[in-house]
Curated annotation (Swiss-Prot):
NDH-1 shuttles electrons from NADH, via FMN and iron-sulfur (Fe-S) centers, to quinones in the respiratory chain. The immediate electron acceptor for the enzyme in this species is believed to be ubiquinone. Couples the redox reaction to proton translocation (for every two electrons transferred, four hydrogen ions are translocated across the cytoplasmic membrane), and thus conserves the redox energy in a proton gradient. The gene is nuoC. This is NADH-quinone oxidoreductase subunit C. The keyword Cell membrane applies. It is found in: Cell inner membrane. It comes from Bartonella henselae (strain ATCC 49882 / DSM 28221 / CCUG 30454 / Houston 1) (Rochalimaea henselae). GO terms for molecular function: NADH dehydrogenase (ubiquinone) activity; NADH:ubiquinone reductase (non-electrogenic) activity; quinone binding.
Length: 202
């Protein structure tokens, strides 16, 4: 399998050349990073070329790296049933620059791109219906971004008296707590309150 991936990596480098920013073969997986303006050409090539035939798209997801200028990775997971190989294609972007939609290349990409937009706010140009798919209509923000608060902004609940769903500011029933768990391998560095057994053993 790894020999097949090494051959495929060399082949893709030779054919796609400057359309690729990076090729990584690690842990038995091949990842290629496409230039943003070349993502359509790269996806069409790996789908149609006889040595690739990655005709199935199994997922599109996002990853947020807030410290980078291009903070988002869009990751396409592709499968070639003919060659029994998998390929990950990545492209990097930010909040304002859209990624070309893969819907015309892989018809199953439509909902994956909507989910990526909903969770991360990544824009896809040429998408036929780019709107939220998992969160509510009035939802503010994108919940899988690293800068999105863990508690969210609002909470919704069904009000039995009003007979409708209502939105309210988040009310925390208790302060955020920091749990200091002990490592079973290191043992306690200090004696916990009310732990006389440990105190007696020392």
């Amino acid at each position: 399998m790894s020999e097949s991936l090494e051959e495929l990596a060399a082949y893709l480098k030779s054919k796609l050349g400057d359309k690729l920013e990076e090729t990584v073969l690690a842990f038995g997986e091949l990842t290629i990073v496409s230039r943003l303006d070349a993502i359509t050409d790269v996806l069409i090539f790996v789908r149609d070329d006889s040595r690739c035939q990655f005709i199935n798209i199994t997922d599109i997801s996002g990853v947020d790296y807030p410290c980078r200028d291009k903070r988002f990775d869009v990751s396409y997971q592709l499968l070639s049933p003919r060659h029994n190989l998998r390929l990950r294609v990545k492209v990097r972007t930010d909040e304002n620059i859209p990624v070309a939609s893969a819907c015309s290349i892989y018809p199953g990409a439509e909902w994956y791109e909507r989910e990526t937009y909903d969770m991360y706010g990544i824009l896809f140009s040429g998408h036929p219906d780019l709107r939220r798919i998992l969160t509510d209509y009035g939802f503010e923000g994108h919940p899988l971004r690293k800068d999105f608060p863990v508690t969210g902004f609002v909470e919704c609940r069904y009000d039995n008296e009003a007979k409708r769903v209502i939105y309210e500011p988040v009310v925390l029933r208790q302060e955020m707590r920091n749990f200091d768990f002990l490592s079973p391998w290191e043992g306690a560095q200090y004696i916990l309150p009310c732990d006389e057994k440990t105190k007696d053993k020392r």
